[in-house]
Curated annotation (Swiss-Prot):
This protein's UniProt keywords: Host membrane, Membrane, Secreted, Transmembrane, Transmembrane helix, Virulence
Source species of the chain: Pseudomonas aeruginosa (strain ATCC 15692 / DSM 22644 / CIP 104116 / JCM 14847 / LMG 12228 / 1C / PRS 101 / PAO1)
Location of this chain's protein in the cell: Host membrane; Secreted
Record note on disruption phenotype: Deletion mutant together with deletion of its cognate immunity protein Tsi4 leads to a significant loss of fitness advantage when placed in competition with parental strains.
Bilayer-spanning residue ranges: 20-40, 116-136, 140-160, 171-191
One GO term describing the cellular component: host cell membrane
Highest taxon listed in the record's lineage: Bacteria
Protein name as it appears in the record: Toxin protein Tse4
Known function: Toxin secreted by the H1 type VI (H1-T6SS) secretion system into the periplasm of recipient cells.
Keyword Membrane: yes
């Protein structure tokens, strides 16, 4: 069996996904998104978290049709956006990192820096999936950002990125229905926070 380039052993948590809502927008390759996630704690309490981030992405699609006088065009750049309400169908799983030996996640493990990836496709209505690594080490994150800022230290930043991803307390995997100004598909990676 081949080893993943960034091994992060995960197990299912006793926290359960309840629902989520969110939205995002892209202009050319720049992306931003945010939302709300509701989880059921092992004690049976609904706990809400907010998240947001900025990043970059790629997409493949066709030009959106013109709606009356509304033309979603920014001089030579593609623009898109989609969102999901809690009422729309969605599903998810909460995973805990093996590094939390002998215990499950606590509320504090979820908050702090996070990295996430979103994949989506649709024609007005569509579907999307999100994978969030949460509870990243903030000191490692700052070190990776500094090291990656210069071509002279980029190799150091790349090796520290592996440590940063392995510092994660867990992961959230979510998928659901969305609606918006979309006519194709795309993927984006974000750096943000869960709070």
């Amino acid at each position: 069996m081949s080893q993943l380039p960034i091994p992060l052993p995960l197990n299912e948590s006793r926290w359960r996904y309840v629902t989520a809502s969110g939205g995002g927008m892209t202009v050319a390759f720049l992306a931003g998104s945010g939302g709300s996630i509701t989880l059921l704690s092992p004690e049976g309490e609904n706990v809400s978290f907010r998240y947001g981030g900025v990043g970059g992405g790629i997409g493949l699609g066709m030009r959106l049709p013109r709606f009356g006088k509304v033309n979603l065009n920014v001089k030579g750049k593609s623009v898109g956006g989609a969102g999901a309400l809690e009422a729309l169908p969605s599903t998810g799983t909460v995973l805990v990192a093996d590094g939390l030996v002998g215990r499950d996640l606590s509320r504090g493990d979820f908050t702090g820096p996070c990295m996430y990836v979103e994949l989506g496709a649709g024609v007005i209505a569509g579907g999307s999936g999100t994978a969030i690594l949460f509870g990243l080490d903030p000191k490692l994150l700052a070190a990776v950002a500094l090291a990656s800022a210069s071509p002279l230290t980029a190799a150091l930043g790349a090796s520290m990125s592996r440590q940063l991803l392995q510092s994660s307390r867990g992961a959230l995997l979510m998928a659901g229905v969305n609606v918006g100004a979309q006519f194709g598909g795309g993927a984006a990676a974000y750096l943000g926070a869960l709070f």
